[in-house]
Amino acid sequence: MSSDDKNKPGEPKNEPKQCDPGCEQKCETKCQPSCLKRLLQRCSEKCQPPKCPPPKCTPCPPCPPSCPPPPKCPPPCPPPCPPPCPPPCPPKPCVKSCPPKCPPPCPPPE
């Protein structure tokens, strides 16, 4: 507010005596307008809503620690190797020729 609002000509300076004390305490709009103008600053301070104490809340549980970044895993393993081959078989002798022919039968006795 400018100083003109506070000291308008024609308004007596002992104006608060005209104000209803209840109006000053309650800051009601039905009070005399000239009285309200004079008391607006004091009134706005008195009419603040009562400051309630902060509610007694239980403290919030702490947040779990954030996870570290995942480790860099190696690439997946290749498929397992096949079982080793068995040892080579021993050589088998191959039959290359027929057995000798039988001798001629013996001549009959005379």
UniProtKB/Swiss-Prot annotation:
Protein name per the record: Late cornified envelope-like proline-rich protein 1
InterPro entries in the record: Lelp1
Family: Belongs to the cornifin (SPRR) family.
Region span, Disordered: 1-24
Domain of life: Eukaryota
Gene that encodes it: LELP1
